[in-house]
Structures are given as C-alpha cells and as structure tokens.
Amino acid sequence: MASTTTCTRFTDEYQLFEELGKGAFSVVRRCMKIPTGQEYAAKIINTKKLSARDHQKLEREARICRLLKHPNIVRLHDSISEEGFHYLVFDLVTGGELFEDIVAREYYSEADASHCIQQILESVNHCHLNGIVHRDLKPENLLLASKSKGAAVKLADFGLAIEVQGDQQAWFGFAGTPGYLSPEVLRKDPYGKPVDMWACGVILYILLVGYPPFWDEDQHRLYQQIKAGAYDFPSPEWDTVTPEAKDLINKMLTINPAKRITASEALKHPWICQRSTVASMMHRQETVDCLKKFNARRKLKGAILTTMLATRNFSAAKSLLKKPDGVKESTESSNTTIEDEDVKARKQEIIKVTEQLIEAINNGDFEAYTKICDPGLTAFEPEALGNLVEGMDFHRFYFENALSKSNKPIHTIILNPHVHLVGDDAACIAYIRLTQYMDGSGMPKTMQSEETRVWHRRDGKWQNVHFHRSGSPTVPIKPPCIPNGKENFSGGTSLWQNI
C-alpha cells in the first residue's frame, strides 16, 4: 500500500543501484527494499531545484499515483521526503517500451494491435473512473512489465496528469506532446477526459501502420492539421486494415470532444471485444518496418533534448527550447512534452480579474469591489493629492455618492496590458484604461489613465492589494457649480477612474 513517509529516511530502507533514466531535475534508479529484497524503480527528485509551483506539481503527481491501482498502470509503492530530495518508489518495469518490443517481434498483426490498445484503454478507463486525466499519452509512456512474451502493457509518467470532477471541462493549461495534442487544447478551449481518447486514436493509428496521422516539420502546420482533423487512410498500407479498425480510429479522432468515444465505450467496440473474429491476423511487415523508422526518429530527438537538459541549467534549457510563445521548436514536435500554463494561462487570469474589478466599478457594485480587493488596499492617485490612501473608506465615498446613483452608460477598455508574474502567488499588471461615457449635454467623452495594479493570491483567490494611477483628473458628471450656464469639465474628481 502506498504511503507518505517523512519520519523514515529513504536510505534506511532502500539500497540504490544503477541509473535507469534521467529527467530535467530527477533521476530514476533501480533500488531494493532491504527488509524484503524486493526490487523497485526509485524516481529521485532534487527538491532544492524546484519552485513552489513545481513542489505543488510533485505533490499532485504523488497523490494521483497513490490513487491509481491497476494491472496496466505503473504502481507507486512509496513516497518519501528527505532534506533536499523526494523519492517516489514505483514498480520496476523491465520490458522497455511497447513500441520497441513490437519491432523486435517476428509476427505482428492487427489483432496484436487490438490487444495493445485494449490494455491502454483499460488503463485510461481506470484513470477516468478515478477522475484523472493523463494528458500525455504517447509511446514513450507505454512500457512492458517484463521481457516475457505477453507481458502486460503499463501506462507510466503521471507528471502532467490532473484531477477532474466527473465530466468537468475547464482550461487546465496548454500541456502535452505536440503530435498527440487534441483540437480542443490547441484551440485553448475547456477540456477534460476526451483529450486522452484523442491521443489513444493517434497511438492506434501508429500501431496499425507505423507512422502518425498528423505530421509536419513545421509546428504551426502540424497544429492546423490536428485542428482540422485532416488525416486519411492512404493506399496501399490501409487497404489491408479492417473497416472496424478504421471505424474505431474515426470515433477516437472526432474533432468534437462531446461526440468522441469514451474509454469505456471503446472497450466495447467490436474490434476490441470481438478481436478473434473481427481483427485481421495477417502479419504486417510494412508496419514493423515503418515503426522502426518512427522509433529511431523519436529516440534521436529525445536524446538531443535529454543532453540539452542535462548539460544546461534547467530554466535556461527551457528557454532555449521554446519559441517566444512558450511552444517548443518544431524539431522536437514529435515527442517532446510541453506544459505552458505557467505563463499564458496565469497572465490571462490576471487580465480577467482586472477586467472584473473595473466592471464592478462601472456597475457601482461596492460589494463585488470589496470581494476583489484586499481590505488594506493601498493606492496612489491624483484625487488623493499625492498621498498614499489605505483601506476602503476613500473608495466607499465615491461608490455611495456617485457611482451607485449614476445611470449613465459607461464603457471601459484596457489597452496594452502587460503582466509580470512575481512568484507563484503574486502578479503586477500595467495598462492604459480608456473610459467612454456621455456627459450632461449628451456628448460622448473619453477619459484616459495609466494604471498599475498589484495582485496577491490568497486561498486560491486573486485580490488587488495596491494600485497606482496617473493622469489628469476629470469629472464625467455635472459639477455643483456651472458658471455662465455652461458645464465645466476642466477640473474636479474622476468619479469612475479614481478607484
């Protein structure tokens, strides 16, 4: 049974042996539990190199792996924290990658492909039943329990996996491996369990012919193919594949996630559950030959990436491997895992909450405003005559005496927002704020101010803790005195833009 231990040192219970693999800030080594002599694989994470957000991801991975107990999933047996290191103790799987095993076989048929994808679907179905979305299904994460003939396929690496409630669809960030990304992720739409089924469709396609359904050296063109669902079954290699196999692929590679087949439904598909009578038993030598080339290509790219990450500072390596928009270069597009929510999604979150705050101001909704602002909010603004304003009373005055009593339409635009993320729970946004309104004579007016807001996240909610506004104060409502019977808007207080 998996357990979290902090009181017992890993070195007291386990003996370490040779290295099995290496990541950016982790290494996997064979180990033995001293009291029992049982062998495992220990993933050793150097926690000194992790940010607070990386720590959260590590905790999430351990939590998810403890939950999943299935014959087709690599099992987590122990999770141990020490000073500077965290140890995840997994099953020792010795059979290597599924795709490497296939090319070494003397005989490989459509029925064998059906058996492979069935085991993958069993693992995915178990994940989905437990509210887990893997998000990174690909050949590198499909291992064999041993080198014995007929060894079980094991799904590995839950580093990108997320927890969802039921059939929840939400934006969990841009994460996965380019060739296996679903259309909804590429469109930045809310997503959920169906992303795993899309990846299963890509994997099944490769299992049958040895090459992927979507491929282009240019990543932009690759993504366009995926979003359009632009794949086909070309001759002659697909001529010998049964219609039932193609039907299952079509159901998996359905662009609309709501109409995409689920894991439980796929397991009931005739090509899976009636394999002996439906799937072809003909040996597919061309598939094996193509798969050898496919394996060689992804292994070369994987080796290049590993070398770069192992020989450079990790954050520097990440920046070298990424384009300005946070997406990896196309030379790594076939098998490089990417996770981009740390930048784009978090910045968008800050812009969105800033817009919500301004909407509360425009609506004169002080209650909504106070929910978004810290009670000790500080501010510099022209109306405070250079003084630092602290607390909500200064702002309450305008809400109660002007904003809530105004029924004039107001429209605000945020121009050129720039967000700086300061750690995991703080951010700063600078922007130009344009406010359009109708003056007392019915003429349209526009006010401009330059604003900076500092946000802090507490208990999962962003709160505005400070803002600084510059610009000349102007009054969008009728002042108390109108000399010569004319309205004067040259001075006074900006009742919409002072908060």
From Swiss-Prot:
Compartments, as annotated in UniProt: Cell membrane, Sarcolemma; Sarcoplasmic reticulum membrane
- Which residues does UniProt mark as catalytic? D136 (proton acceptor)
What triggers expression?
Answer: Activity is induced in skeletal muscle during exercise.
State the reactions this protein catalyses. Answer: L-seryl-[protein] + ATP = O-phospho-L-seryl-[protein] + ADP + H(+); L-threonyl-[protein] + ATP = O-phospho-L-threonyl-[protein] + ADP + H(+)
Give me the ranges of the annotated region Calmodulin-binding: 291-301
For the modification Phosphothreonine, which residues carry it? T287, T306, T307, T331, T336, T337
Q: Which Pfam families match?
A: CaMKII_AD, Pkinase
* Activity regulation note: Activated by Ca(2+)/calmodulin. Binding of calmodulin results in conformational change that relieves intrasteric autoinhibition and allows autophosphorylation of Thr-287 which turns the kinase in a constitutively active form and confers to the kinase a Ca(2+)-independent activity.
Which stretches of sequence are listed as region Autoinhibitory domain?
283-292
Q: Which GO terms describe its cellular component?
A: calcium- and calmodulin-dependent protein kinase complex; cytoplasm; cytosol; endocytic vesicle membrane; membrane; neuron projection; nucleoplasm; nucleus
List its EC numbers.
2.7.11.17
SUPFAM superfamilies, alphabetically? NTF2-like, Protein kinase-like (PK-like)
- What keywords does the record list, in alphabetical order? Acetylation, ATP-binding, Calmodulin-binding, Cell membrane, Kinase, Membrane, Nucleotide-binding, Phosphoprotein, Sarcoplasmic reticulum, Serine/threonine-protein kinase, Transferase
- What does the UniProt PTM comment say about this protein? Autophosphorylation of Thr-287 following activation by Ca(2+)/calmodulin. Phosphorylation of Thr-287 locks the kinase into an activated state.
Topology versus the membrane: Peripheral membrane protein
Please provide, alphabetically and separated by semicolons, the GO molecular function terms listed in this UniProt record.
Answer: ATP binding; calcium/calmodulin-dependent protein kinase activity; calmodulin binding; identical protein binding; protein homodimerization activity; protein serine kinase activity; protein serine/threonine kinase activity; sodium channel inhibitor activity
GO annotation terms (biological process): cardiac muscle cell contraction; cellular response to calcium ion; endoplasmic reticulum calcium ion homeostasis; long-term synaptic potentiation; negative regulation of sodium ion transmembrane transport; positive regulation of cardiac muscle cell apoptotic process; positive regulation of cardiac muscle hypertrophy; protein phosphorylation
InterPro entries xrefs: Ca/CaM-dep_prot_kinase-assoc (IPR013543), Kinase-like_dom_sf (IPR011009), NTF2-like_dom_sf (IPR032710), Prot_kinase_dom (IPR000719), Protein_kinase_ATP_BS (IPR017441), Ser/Thr_kinase_AS (IPR008271)
Residues modified as N6-acetyllysine: K318
Q: What is its main location?
A: membrane
As annotated in Swiss-Prot or TrEMBL, what is the tissue specificity of this protein?
Expressed in cardiac muscle and skeletal muscle. Isoform Delta 3, isoform Delta 2, isoform Delta 8 and isoform Delta 9 are expressed in cardiac muscle. Isoform Delta 11 is expressed in skeletal muscle.
Question: Where on the chain is N-acetylalanine found, per UniProt?
Answer: A2
- The organism's superkingdom is given as Eukaryota
| Family, similarity comment | Belongs to the protein kinase superfamily. CAMK Ser/Thr protein kinase family. CaMK subfamily.
Protein function: Calcium/calmodulin-dependent protein kinase involved in the regulation of Ca(2+) homeostatis and excitation-contraction coupling (ECC) in heart by targeting ion channels, transporters and accessory proteins involved in Ca(2+) influx into the myocyte, Ca(2+) release from the sarcoplasmic reticulum (SR), SR Ca(2+) uptake and Na(+) and K(+) channel transport. Targets also transcription factors and signaling molecules to regulate heart function. In its activated form, is involved in the pathogenesis of dilated cardiomyopathy and heart failure.
What's the protein name? Calcium/calmodulin-dependent protein kinase type II subunit delta
Q: Provide the species name.
A: Homo sapiens (Human)
State which gene encodes it: CAMK2D
